[in-house]
Amino acid sequence: MSNHKDYRCYGLRLLTVTAVFLALIAGFNGFFDPYQVIGTPTIKGLNQVKREKDIQVRLFKAVAVNKIEAKSLFLGSSRTEFGLDTHHPGLSDLQPGYNLAITGGNMYEVRRYFDHAIATQPEVKEIILSLDFFMFNQAKKNTPDFREERLGTRNLFVGDLFEVLLSKPAFISSLRTLKNSFSRPNNPGFFYEDGRRNPDSTIEQVYFNQGVIPRFRMVLRDFLVRPDLYGTYQLSVDYLNDLNAVITTSQQRGIRLHLFISPSHALQWEAIRVAGLWSEFEAWKRALVNLSPIWDFSGYNSMTTEAIADPMQYYIESSHYRKELGDLVLNRILDYRPETVPSDFGILLTPTNLETHLEQIRRDRELWAQENPKWVEFVEALKP
């Protein structure tokens, strides 16, 4: 009988210690809230710098968009995250807005975040969706931090709640949040409050303050090597269907939907050519236009051919453009101060003008290549 009581007491003590330990961990992580999903008030010098949000983009954005009653949204990949500002004056009557683009997303993920937004944000009136070639690659699978269960609801998914309060990664992120908040209290982190990425933090933390040419080289090599980018490519019918679902739902809901192809730098389009995917690139555009008119900012125009030198006005590297260029994109799409936009930047593609436009890009490419053999060789040298 005595042994039985001893075991019982031991078990109760163990449960109590475990419960207290877990409560302390949960309280610690809840206070520092490294992914900004709990909503803990911030205290300067302790928990206000949320740089760890970068490792839980899909989680924090799914939660953040629920808090603002958005009237306008941006969707797409990290190109949209960097380039489009929700406070653009052309959207002044559609505030608040939120940049719901997700890093490295495929078209299915983008569609599901669209579904999430319209399920929880009944006031959404306008959506601007950026489309990228790699988003439609059959090899581009859902990222590990994508979870269906967190979408379509305003409530925090139980699995996510465990992840942010009791997991080891969250504890490490909380410690880093304390360190970052204490050592650099005025640092905005990787994201602004409206979901747009901070290019300065990315250049510092991801590219380690390397110059623009090393950044171009790093990104282009990555695109040429990775099979889910340009390493291999097969246009996904399923992803085209996902886009069509977004178009159809927007029409049914009375949401103004603008589609556009990102204005990455000319060297990014050279990488597609070097990868042997130019015909697939054009086939992708044909497939898009078959679904809806779409603004095309790609190609070798007066903006995408900006000279490569430190510093660059419009580009972080070959793939990502800055807000300064994104403002011109929005000027064109929203017909806001159109006189500020170069005439060759942003063409609305329809079945009527598509083939002529594709031919013009080929001619522009030949002229650019003749004038820039150094950069043609630069990209060709990166081919694996």
Model-predicted regions and their roles:
Residues 12-33:
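Hydrophobic membrane-insertion alpha-helices, especially the h-region
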Residues 274-275, 279:
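Small-residue-rich helix-loop
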Residues 131, 140, 144-252, 344-384:
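Secreted/periplasmic serine-hydrolase-like ester/acetyl group-modifying domain
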Residues 249-273:
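Active-site segments of SGNH/GDSL-like serine hydrolases
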Residues 69, 75-163:
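Membrane-embedded segments
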Residues 282-384:
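C-terminal regions of proteins
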Residues 47-74:
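Short extracytoplasmic
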Residues 32-54:
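Alpha-helical transmembrane signal-anchor/signal-peptide segments
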